[in-house]
Every structure is written in C-alpha cells, then in structure tokens.
Curated annotation (Swiss-Prot):
The keyword Membrane does not apply. Keywords: ATP-binding, Chaperone, Nucleotide-binding. It comes from Desulfurococcus mucosus (Desulfurococcus mobilis). This is Thermosome subunit beta. Forms a Heterooligomeric complex of two stacked eight-membered rings. InterPro entries: Chaperone_TCP-1, Chaperonin_TCP-1_CS, Cpn60/GroEL/TCP-1, GroEL-like_apical_dom_sf, GROEL-like_equatorial_sf, TCP-1-like_intermed_sf, TCP-1_chaperonin, thermosome_alpha.
C-alpha cells in the first residue's frame, strides 16, 4: 500500500516514535531491562540501548533511522544512545502536534535547528573543566554511567577499575588528552563473582603454555614478541625430496633439528626467558625451549601481540635472525593461572604499560555479558570526560536548565519558529520526565517543581532524587557526566527528527 504527503509523514513519525517508546522504559537508574529472543531462540537480557536496537529486527525505514542514530552515538561517544533516541521521539511527538496546527515541516525544522544551536552553546557555557589529576571527579563520571546498569551494586568497584584503566592508557597530544580504548583489553570468564573481576597492568592471554616441561611462572620476564613461526615451513613451490637410503633420512631429520636448535639458541642468546608467538611452534622447538627453561605461548592474536608491544615496551620481530636484546619486552611476572575452567597466561607488572587488561568474572553468563557492556560504557564515559576536558551535572539537571534557556530564546524569535523552539524545550524536558516516570513518581508535579527550582540563582544543578522525590544538587550528589554525551545526543536526535520530517 502506497502512502504519500502528510499520510506518509505521519506513518514515519509513528514508526520512529514506536522505537522511542520501546526504549523509554529502560532509561535511567530505575529503568527496566528488556528480554530479547531471536529467531534461533537465543535470549539476551539487557538495559543497553545500542544492544536492544541492534538485536531488535526492525523493518520500517523511518524506524531504522533511529537505530542508525543509536549506532552513531554508540560509536562516537560510547554512551547516551537511549537519550538520542528518546529525544528524537519527543521532537517528533511535538512536531506532529505542530503539523496538526498546519505549520509547515520546513518551519518546524528551522525552529529545531535554531534551538539545537542555542542548546549546544548553553551546554558549553554550563560545563566545568576536569583534568587527569582529578581522580575523584572521574570516578563520579564512571559511577554515573554505571548507575542504570545491571552491575549497579558493584558500581564503586567497577568505577575504580574504569578510571585506573583509562588513566593508564591516556596520552597527551599537545594540550589534548587522547584515549584509544582498543588499548584496554576486556576478557570475560564465567565463574566466581562480579567482585572477583580485576584490572591487570599488562596483558592476559587466553592461551596455555605450550609444553608441559616449561616453567609455569617466570619472574623478571624478558619477552620476545614473535611474528614468525618457530617451525620449518613447507616451501611455496611443489618440491619433493627423493631419499634412497636410511642415512639420508637420518641426515634430513638431523638438519631440521639443527635449524630449530639454532632458532632457540638465538632466542636464548639475547637473554629471553618468555616467547609469545603469533604463529606455530614446532614440537621439537618446544622441547628445546623447555630444556632452556623458556616459557612459550603460541598462536596469539595479532591484536594481542600489538597490545603486548605497548604494555611491555618490546618490539614485534618478524625474523628471528634480526632479534636483538633491545627488542625484548619486560614484565615483572609471567604466569599461567587457572581462571574458571580455563588456563590463561598473565603478563603483568609491566613498567608504565600503555595497554592494560580487565578480566570480568560473574556467576551467570548473561550477567558477565551485561557487565562487559556496562564497563565499556563506563570506560567510554571516562575517556570522553578526559577528551572533552569538560563535565556537566547529570540526572536531568542539564536538560531542564537547557529547556529554560531555549524558552527564553523562543520569546526573542518572531514568527511560527517560536512554536517549534518551545516544542524543542518541551522535548528536552521529556528526557527528565522519562527518568521521573520510570521511578514511579508523578511527572507533572516534578516538572513544575524543577522549572521553579531552575529559575533560582543556584538552580542549574538541581534535579529530582529518584528514590525520595526531593530536589537535590546533582553536582554535590556526584551525578556527573561528560558534556559530549548530551551534546552528541542533542545533535543526533535533532538530525534524526529533521530527516524524518523532510
């Protein structure tokens, strides 16, 4: 069935709002979780906006746009996906009311754009500086991100891990902080409790030591990072060797052994006592390494090898002949440990590692998966705060403050755009209303309370304590978030709403 004109626009708005309404109930610290069952019967229980929209099989093109908004928000800042989607839904809800009053979509879009620019300007003025040394404030940022997650009860513990991990991998580039979260390795292992999770100042390899005769623990490790096989590879051309008598075979095998022996001798001669190899290690080479007391791990992922390079200060070597003592990495301890059902190799105690690992434990498979999503959001929040160098109050305080300023802008703008700008202010309030509704409080009462509070001199940090319904200062309560999460959500939500209205 083909729809055109206003009917098509209304259908698109309806579809996009359906997605927004679906996400709304999961928003905020009192938000619910969703259980998603796919075609194969696999169950995912999550509160994470990006995951919900990724797993939901959505067909409608307008609704798909909101899914893309969530994905772009997730890849850009790593958190605040629900906020972008809910804001887009609210903007479309009020746009529909304006369309009913015969206001043209172009006028609405123009008003929304003006309001968005004003909001971003005010947001920048509201923001407070934060730096690397203010660890307590960074912890508050991580804690705020974890408040609405399944790991809520262990949020102090995980916030601490997130801050320590990000501080370890942050780099100064000019006067900016640069954080590459790929340098933080996250490993999930079922078993134990959430509080058994740990931060390792080094790298954890999900591998075993290759030979039973090798040491399981090496202190003051000098590590070779090898991107070449410790085995004799077959030639690329189809060659064959014809052997006429047993002596020739004996010599042939002896020659192979000598080549491998030379490789191992070269490794031992530079003072190495640990080998981490990306390719295979021949059984004969394993035997020689074990005799020399060298611990070896094989078939390690390239990405893990690169992280090890950053953690240990070593260099990846592609040819054993070129190996020198300067190429070796250093770690205080390399040890094989049993974690859950599996054995893993811990390389830790590295000097000032630029790459670290977080091992997440938990009794339930789904809990560990959700804990991983939560810790990624917390890491992103801390990284964003350091990148921006600015933070704002959370808990709906910033949204209410922005709505107040945008209403003032509406009074200064003539024409029908004024109505669209007011609608934008209502949509921003809609984010705070959703928090309040999900906590089971009366939204109308609370919004009136908040509007009045924000007119006061000291009002910009005030929002509702969702447990009691009282007004509290979010900054003093430690509810703080990076400015980029809200700024990006406003940009992405407004763009999505305007594209759908076009």
């Amino acid at each position: 069935q083909r729809t055109t004109g206003r009917d098509a626009l209304r259908t698109n708005i309806l579809a996009a709002r359906a997605i927004s309404e679906m996400i709304k109930t999961t928003y905020g610290p009192k938000g619910m979780d969703k259980m998603l069952v796919d075609a194969l019967g696999d169950v995912t229980i999550t509160n994470d906006g990006a995951t919900i929209l990724d797993k939901a099989e959505i067909q409608h093109p307008a609704a798909k746009m909101l899914v893309q908004v969530a994905k772009s928000q997730d890849s850009e800042v790593g958190d605040g996906t629900k906020r972008a989607v809910i804001l887009a839904g609210e903007l479309l809800k009020y746009a529909e009311e304006l369309l009913d009053k015969n206001i043209h979509p172009t006028v609405i879009i123009s008003g929304y754009r003006m309001a968005m620019e004003e909001a971003l300007k005010i947001l920048d003025q509201m923001a407070e500086p934060i730096d690397l040394n203010n660890e307590e404030l960074l912890r508050k940022v991580a804690r705020t991100s974890l408040t609405s997650k399944a790991v809520h009860d262990a949020r102090e513990f995980f916030a601490d891990i997130a801050v320590k991990a990000v501080k370890q991998v942050v780099e100064k580039r000019g006067d900016k902080n640069y954080v590459d979260l790929d340098n933080i390795q996250i490993i999930k292992k079922y078993g134990g409790a959430l509080l058994d999770s740990m931060l390792v100042y080094g790298i954890v390899l999900d591998k075993e030591v290759v030979h039973p005769g090798m040491p399981r623990r090496v202190e003051n490790a000098k590590i070779v990072l090898l991107d070449a096989p410790l085995e004799i590879e077959k030639p690329e051309i189809d060659a064959e060797i014809r052997i006429n008598d047993p002596e020739q075979l004996e010599k042939f095998l002896q020659q192979e052994e000598e080549i491998l022996m030379k490789m191992v001798d070269k490794i031992a001669s530079v003072g190495a006592n640990v080998v981490v190899c990306q390719k295979g290690i021949d059984e004969v080479a394993q035997h020689f390494l074990a005799k020399k007391g060298i611990l070896a791990v094989r078939r390690v992922k390239r990405s893990d090898l690169e992280k090890l390079e950053r953690a240990t200060g070593g260099r990846i070597v592609s040819n054993i002949e070129d190996l020198t003592p300067e190429d070796l990495g250093y770690a205080a301890l390399v040890e094989e440990r049993k974690v859950g059902e599996d054995k893993m190799v811990f390389i830790e105690g590295c000097k000032n590692p630029r790459s670290v690992s977080i091992v997440i434990r938990g009794g339930l498979e789904r809990l560990v998966d959700e804990a991983e999503r939560s810790i990624r959001d917390a890491l992103s929040a801390v990284a964003d705060a350091l990148r921006d160098g600015k933070v704002i109050p959370g808990g709906g305080a910033a949204e209410i403050e922005l709505a107040k300023h945008i209403r003032r802008l509406a009074t200064r703008v003539g024409g029908k755009e004024q109505l669209a700008i007011e609608a934008f202010a209502k949509a921003l309030e809609g984010l705070a209303v959703t928090l309040v509704e999900n906590a089971g409080l009366d939204p109308i009462d609370m919004v009136m309370k908040l509007r009045a509070a924000h007119e006061r001199e000291d009002g910009k940090y005030l929002s509702i304590d969702l447990a009691t319904g009282d007004l509290v200062n979010m900054r003093e309560k430690g509810v703080i978030e990076p400015v980029s999460i809200l700024a990006n959500a406003i940009k992405a939500g407004t763009e999505a709403a305007t594209i759908i209205m076009r």
